[in-house]
Amino acid sequence: MNPFYNHSMHNWTKSLSKVEKINLGRYGLSPVITLRGVIIDWDFLRAYIRLWDPEVHVFRFGAMMEEMCPLFEEFCPIIGCDLNAPLVKHEVKIGYIRSFETLFQFSRPQARAMIVDDQKAILLPLIDEFSEACPNDPDRMRLRMRALVFCLLAGFLFNQDPGFGDLRLCPMVRQMEDMGCIGGIVLAETIRSLDRAALGFDDWTVSVTSLPGPPVNPNEPSRDATNCSIVIEKDPLLRFG
């Protein structure tokens, strides 16, 4: 994990004003800030992966093999999104660089300076650009909120490449700005990652509804508070339909 990125996000979220925290509710991510300090319990993590049945996507436990599965209605409040809102969908399209420019009102040179391989944005310069609040400039504050949401999505909910943000997240930020619900995508990717972990694949990651976590090696426990409790597949965006 990039310690500079982690530190920058920590400072940014600490600096949010009361109004900005309230405005995060529009995107359905308010609890993400609240859960920043959660420390992963590795024993619990390993235990619930052993209880997961990847065939039917449920936890099985007890002598009677009771079943429990993550429910959309229970999952959305954890993230903070409205389960009755229209679902955020992944838009398969070309021109994601243009989406990045438009989302943050960057010039082409500005955007290009932050983009790697035409596919992902380096998050540190994006944080540097928007981490300073400008309360007297509403347009700038709106772009700052978009940047924060983009970084939270890239570094927490879809953290397959810590320190970078997939450009395919840009259309999702716009849908969330219109109060779309991200819970369906996050739940689907959580289940897929649980499946991969239970089947023994090593390319699954953990993250805490907040800051990014590195790829997990179950044989090397860590108490890093920037890791966390929701399991996400390493490259979730590849499977959106």
Question: Where are the language model's segments positioned?
Answer:
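Extended, charge-rich alpha-helical regions
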Residues: 115-132, 136, 140, 211-241
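Compositionally biased, low-complexity segments enriched in small residues
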Residues: 2-5, 9, 205, 222, ...
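N-terminal leader regions that mediate targeting or early regulatory function
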Residues: 1-201
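Extended alpha-helical, oligomerization-prone segments that build pores/tubes and scaffolds
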Residues: 202-204, 214
